[in-house]
Amino acid sequence: MVQLDDALQDAYKKVEREESLILGAKAMVASTKNPEVKRRLESNIAVSENNIKYLRERIDALKVESGSERESQSDKDSSKKYSDSAKSTNSDDHLLSYNRSAFDLFNSEKPLSPEKISTMLQHLQMRLSIEQQCVSGIEKIMSLYSKEQKDKTDVIIKLKEGKQKVNLLKRSLKRYNELHIPFDISTPSSEEKQQASGLNFRGLAKPISGTLKVTIHSLRNIEHTSFLQTHSFTMPSYAVLYVDDAQVAKSRISQTDTWDETFIFDVHRAKEFQIIIYEKKKDFDIPIALILIPTTIIAEELRRKRNIQEMSETSWKPSIAESASRSDEKGSKSDPINAPNSSSSISTNSPLAPTAYYKLLSKSWLSLEPVGQICISLSFSKRTTKRQFPETGLGRQGAIRQKKEDVVASQVGHQFVQRQFYQIMRCAVCAELFSYSPGLQCENCSFVCHKKCVTKVLASCIAQSNSEKSDFGGLRYRIPHRFEPFNSLGAQWCAHCGFFLPLRRKDCFKCVECGITCHGQCAHLIPDYCGMSNDLKHQLLTELEVSKRPKKPELPNQENKTTNEKVYRKPLSSQNTFDTLPTISQGLLAATQPVTSVLNTSPLPKTPEKDRSLNVTPSSSTPTPASVLAPPSSASLSSSKDANRSVPESPRREKKNRVTLDDFTFLAVLGKGNFGKVMLAEYKVNKKFYAIKVLKKEAILKNEELESLKTEKHVFEVANKEKHPFLLNLFASFQTSTRVYFVMEYILGGDLMVHIQRQQFSVKRARFYGAEVCLALKYFHENGIAYRDLKLDNILLCPDGHIRIADYGLCKENMLLGNTTSTFCGTPEFMAPEILLEQQYSKDVDWWAFGVLMYQMLLGQSPFKGEDEEEIFDAILSDEPLFPINMPADAVSLLRGLLTRDPNQRLGSGPKDANEVMAHPFFASIVWDDLYNKLYEPSYKPLINDPRDLNNFDEEFTSACPTLTPVNTVLTRQQQECFRGFSSFATE
């Protein structure tokens, strides 16, 4: 690793070089009479001056880092002031970087930065490796057309064009390398700040589909081949547009580098957009400049500008409203329920920020490689399906859960799953590159290889125990690698995980003996085979395996026959080995043995009824049923025998221990989600109403949701344990041959989504609901439960005006302090950044969702908007929420604390958990014990005329017919065994 003093010395040398270039260019300007040469030299002088400015800024930063420079007292004060303000809240960094994006990497009018230089070096290095492989392939093709002159001429032209592109990319890399200082100013959050600023290529090649509109206006400072010639006129040029290396448009030929031409074309799963400038020649046209932009960055930039446009049209700002009156703050502290100015919504004097899609065309000067700029206008309309929510306000969104990936192969402990990679990867076995294509990755240690190379994998997985680790077939070759840190300035890939090694990384290592490179965290996973190629290793091991293979014993009376068999017997091939690898059903056998054993079991005979109740005896630990759910009388059973008859029960079984589908009459559909639906039902025994959640067994088994079902039932038991006032309680659960049922208390007021769509909540009302939700989350977290699906749809409003949290389908248990998980699940608008980044996360994701919930209740819209899930995810990872200028400061402070991307800095993330949120000034005067005991009088109570009145529920659901759809699938006995013990009853 380059030391600080070496980095400073290198920076000084680069400044001296740029100054020398300026002096030489000025001398040439004074001596030449060619106007084209003068223009080009003046442009070079401006570029060098800009480079010197950047290098001096880097030198100052390095000096501050080393402490070698003594600043003046005024500089210290200003620097300390900035540092203190930055430490006061980490959201300030996000606010300063709100107008920065990955598109700035290509904008020639944006200043240079270390992030831009390092990222462009990586981007160009990867592109250079592709072009070099293309040139190598063209050279091989040219040898095939040695006898066909016409085809050979075309190949020669392509070869020259490819070599010219390689030269252009090498010149660009040289230019950025001359500005790159190989020293990373190590701060604890340097990578996080870079990610927060948007100056990174997250999801570089994520494909997008839609309509792209490009207008090419003009060029400037382009370097024509006539630059060194005596004549003053420039050669004609034209632009060619490519999408994923396929030509989609071509401009006319221009002598003045001006076009003003517009091109509109559809793209399907496009990854990269290119513009190449060609100069017209007699023999063949020469590429003189190019620009390569990932299509995702174009779509993201237009979405970001749309949000900026919304800010300019409204009085919303991405910062705290410093002008908020202190009277509001004092009022909120005196009485949070009846505070002055809190009876009306915040948006009364401030219009809601528009959410309609805004098609924006903007002129931008983008940097060409290696020199020059191009002025273009871009517009992109994403191809989307039906909108997920209305143009304004809020709408319902279903939760999502990522299904477990299929294990397609197992080798020496690795559990390989198929992954689609959208960048250039390198196989850790054969060392060949593959891009934009699927490969295999170990879900435990991230080892990457081709599917064809899986049988050649020799390195054991780190998840494998020492007793199970392979001894590499007895190959006694143990020479460890000599890894040393190095600066990755070229195209380098990790020898284990196959990813491209980023530039300016402090944890990149290279073996000084054999030259392989890897990440620091991957070095200990590489086997000790320094100096030996993988092909040689595999060949040696194959020969050892053949030599150690036991010979088949020969029978005395079949000597000749056995001899002939040995002559024609073939060795075991790698293909046969791959074919015998376990399938997904075999790989998951241990986890779901009763389910997967269906293959060896004959199905049960099909019954003529739609649903038959199963006689499931509650376990010994199941409480006795409550009186409210007493079993129906014989008269009741006889009156309902014509509707849905139960399976005849053994006389020895007591009927009081059963509740069946025949005991309920379904009246209406109350809700529907991705995992089931909820219906209103009347219990025939006592004529009381209950909400019954219905789930299909087939879907549970197919989606591997059996553990989630058990967790949901256990969370109901936790909620019932103390009869928490703000959690939905369970009264019973039962099952039929095709479905499982949760019998829950019926909340007549509907959910908050219906009420907020009818009327915007006031600050008083939002604070009241938020405080009760906070107590519910506190109870969950104290019991080690992460809720993970907090949203308005899952908060029910009781007739007395208090709330209940429902739907425990995404809950995660054993989430006490320090425990984490990585399941990708939740509702898109409420998912925390760490979930989207597929990182390990804790129960702190609930506080991010709580921040989104409070934002929606206070302002009537979501803080992160988008046309589809991908745009919403991009907004969560890069955008800053907007606040009206009249919003109280304590409310903004609460939202900013909750909507902090760093989970370690998020409000509520510490060991105090909910107590930290409850202590915030926004809830300062709430007496939490009184709130828990429902001593506060709610400001709003839903209007309920009759228990059958469905006016407080969404008409989209209530208009549906309350029937159970037929299920034709018949589950086996082993599959039914998976649901043993599900039926239970609650206690009073």
Swiss-Prot record:
<feature type="domain" description="C2">
    <location>
        <begin position="189"/>
        <end position="315"/>
    </location>
</feature>
<feature type="active site" description="Proton acceptor">
    <location>
        <position position="789"/>
    </location>
</feature>
<keyword id="KW-0808">Transferase</keyword>
<comment type="function">
    <text>Involved in the control of the cell shape. Target of the inhibitor staurosporine.</text>
</comment>
<dbReference type="InterPro" id="IPR035892">
    <property type="entry name" value="C2_domain_sf"/>
</dbReference>
<keyword id="KW-0418">Kinase</keyword>
<dbReference type="InterPro" id="IPR000961">
    <property type="entry name" value="AGC-kinase_C"/>
</dbReference>
<feature type="domain" description="Protein kinase">
    <location>
        <begin position="664"/>
        <end position="923"/>
    </location>
</feature>
<dbReference type="GO" id="GO:0032153">
    <property type="term" value="C:cell division site"/>
</dbReference>
<feature type="domain" description="REM-1 1">
    <location>
        <begin position="1"/>
        <end position="68"/>
    </location>
</feature>
<dbReference type="Pfam" id="PF00069">
    <property type="entry name" value="Pkinase"/>
</dbReference>
<keyword id="KW-0479">Metal-binding</keyword>
<dbReference type="InterPro" id="IPR008271">
    <property type="entry name" value="Ser/Thr_kinase_AS"/>
</dbReference>
<dbReference type="GO" id="GO:0005634">
    <property type="term" value="C:nucleus"/>
</dbReference>
<dbReference type="GO" id="GO:0004674">
    <property type="term" value="F:protein serine/threonine kinase activity"/>
</dbReference>
<dbReference type="InterPro" id="IPR002219">
    <property type="entry name" value="PE/DAG-bd"/>
</dbReference>
<keyword id="KW-0862">Zinc</keyword>
<feature type="region of interest" description="Disordered">
    <location>
        <begin position="598"/>
        <end position="655"/>
    </location>
</feature>
<dbReference type="Pfam" id="PF00433">
    <property type="entry name" value="Pkinase_C"/>
</dbReference>
<feature type="region of interest" description="Disordered">
    <location>
        <begin position="545"/>
        <end position="572"/>
    </location>
</feature>
<dbReference type="GO" id="GO:1903617">
    <property type="term" value="P:positive regulation of mitotic cytokinesis, division site positioning"/>
</dbReference>
<keyword id="KW-0597">Phosphoprotein</keyword>
<dbReference type="GO" id="GO:0008270">
    <property type="term" value="F:zinc ion binding"/>
</dbReference>
<feature type="domain" description="REM-1 2">
    <location>
        <begin position="107"/>
        <end position="182"/>
    </location>
</feature>
<dbReference type="GO" id="GO:0110085">
    <property type="term" value="C:mitotic actomyosin contractile ring"/>
</dbReference>
<dbReference type="GO" id="GO:0008289">
    <property type="term" value="F:lipid binding"/>
</dbReference>
<protein>
    <recommendedName>
        <fullName>Protein kinase C-like 1</fullName>
        <ecNumber>2.7.11.13</ecNumber>
    </recommendedName>
</protein>
<dbReference type="GO" id="GO:0004699">
    <property type="term" value="F:diacylglycerol-dependent, calcium-independent serine/threonine kinase activity"/>
</dbReference>
<dbReference type="Pfam" id="PF02185">
    <property type="entry name" value="HR1"/>
</dbReference>
<dbReference type="Pfam" id="PF00168">
    <property type="entry name" value="C2"/>
</dbReference>
<dbReference type="InterPro" id="IPR011009">
    <property type="entry name" value="Kinase-like_dom_sf"/>
</dbReference>
<dbReference type="InterPro" id="IPR017441">
    <property type="entry name" value="Protein_kinase_ATP_BS"/>
</dbReference>
<feature type="binding site">
    <location>
        <position position="693"/>
    </location>
    <ligand>
        <name>ATP</name>
    </ligand>
</feature>
<keyword id="KW-0547">Nucleotide-binding</keyword>
<feature type="region of interest" description="Disordered">
    <location>
        <begin position="313"/>
        <end position="348"/>
    </location>
</feature>
<keyword id="KW-0133">Cell shape</keyword>
<comment type="similarity">
    <text>Belongs to the protein kinase superfamily. AGC Ser/Thr protein kinase family. PKC subfamily.</text>
</comment>
<dbReference type="InterPro" id="IPR000719">
    <property type="entry name" value="Prot_kinase_dom"/>
</dbReference>
<feature type="zinc finger region" description="Phorbol-ester/DAG-type 2">
    <location>
        <begin position="480"/>
        <end position="530"/>
    </location>
</feature>
<keyword id="KW-0067">ATP-binding</keyword>
<feature type="domain" description="AGC-kinase C-terminal">
    <location>
        <begin position="924"/>
        <end position="988"/>
    </location>
</feature>
<dbReference type="Pfam" id="PF00130">
    <property type="entry name" value="C1_1"/>
</dbReference>
